[in-house]
Amino acid sequence: DCSALVQLALAAGGIDAPRDSGPQHHIGSRIDDSSQLQRGDLVFWHGHVGIMQDGKTLLHANAHHMAVASEPLGDAIARIAIIAGPVTALRRPMPERVR
């Protein structure tokens, strides 16, 4: 699922992360503007999380595609908003233990 994908991706980068998207919501530092997003940043919705491939593309496991999908962030935001509401947080993980 989405949070396991993020947990595994962060682990590959040396960042220890919780298993669920709720606790993952507190990883790293807050990003105030989506124009600042870069590879490895996290995008959160209520009950969902994805990781940025680059400044404009989101990688996430989702029920819409029933797979891990790579899609433009704007498309993901618009589609997910219908089900889960707006983005709740943008975070930049830091290489430190977060548990």
Region spans (language model):
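Aromatic- and glycine-rich peptidoglycan recognition patches
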Residues: 21-24, 29-32, 53-99
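Structural motif
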Residues: 40-41
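A conserved glycine-rich beta-strand in the N-terminal activation segment of trypsin-fold
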Residues: 49-50
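A generic structural signal for residues embedded in beta-strands
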Residues: 44-45, 60
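Catalytic cysteine-centered active-site loop
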Residues: 1-37
